[in-house]
Amino acid sequence: MLVAGDVYRPAAIDQLHVLGEQIGVEVWSDKENKNPVDIAKKAIAEAKQKGFNTVIIDTAGRLAVDQQMMNEIEAIKNAVSPNEILFVVDSMTGQDAVNTAKAFNDKLDFNGVVLTKLDGDTRGGAALSIRSVVDKPIKV
């Protein structure tokens, strides 16, 4: 089950529903609720009730380290006790991603890194730097 937890980007929920439909995965959302922590807790309860064994919570993207949003993502972690936390980064972000990855890892102790847009012309320097700084695997 995919969970639409990005309440900040206007089209995020609809976009996740389209993706879920395209790949045949159920998407849970609550368009009336603007509290990502509450959304995550309700979605986990729904997933358990329906017998899902995998839940992916899509949260708001954070291009820079914003303390309020960092606290929010930590609250989601504490509320749902995930088995795995992945730091997803646009491979075209460059070296700025290293500082963001370090801040996220310090706050969340994530399990690995997922790089998007690798089909572009980036050379992967940020990936190697992130791997070195946070000492977490790059997931494929």
Specify the residue positions occupied by each region the protein language model found.
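P-loop/Walker A NTP-binding module and the surrounding RecA-like catalytic core of P-loop NTPases
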Residues: 1-140
